[in-house]
């Protein structure tokens, strides 16, 4: 499963994202994070058990401050 997440860039953002994934016992197989002009773009490839686990992850990520957008790609 591949997700693209946009945030207003800030310190400890990557930590917050990985903690959200870890809390659901999901594995990250790849992560690419870039920042440009105050916007952080993060593309994560995850091992997802089912759609319910994905929805729980989206809910957790939506609670992270400064979220702009999250989408499945």
Name each region found by the language model.
Residues 1-73:
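A conserved regulatory-domain signal marking ACT and ACT-like small-molecule sensing domains
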């Amino acid at each position: 499963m591949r997700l693209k997440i946009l945030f207003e860039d800030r310190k400890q953002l990557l930590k917050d994202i990985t903690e959200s994934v870890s809390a659901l016992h999901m594995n990250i197989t790849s992560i690419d994070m870039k920042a440009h002009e105050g916007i952080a773009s993060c593309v994560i490839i995850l091992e997802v058990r089912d759609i319910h686990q994905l929805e729980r992850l989206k809910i957790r990520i939506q609670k992270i401050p400064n979220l702009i957008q999250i989408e499945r790609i």
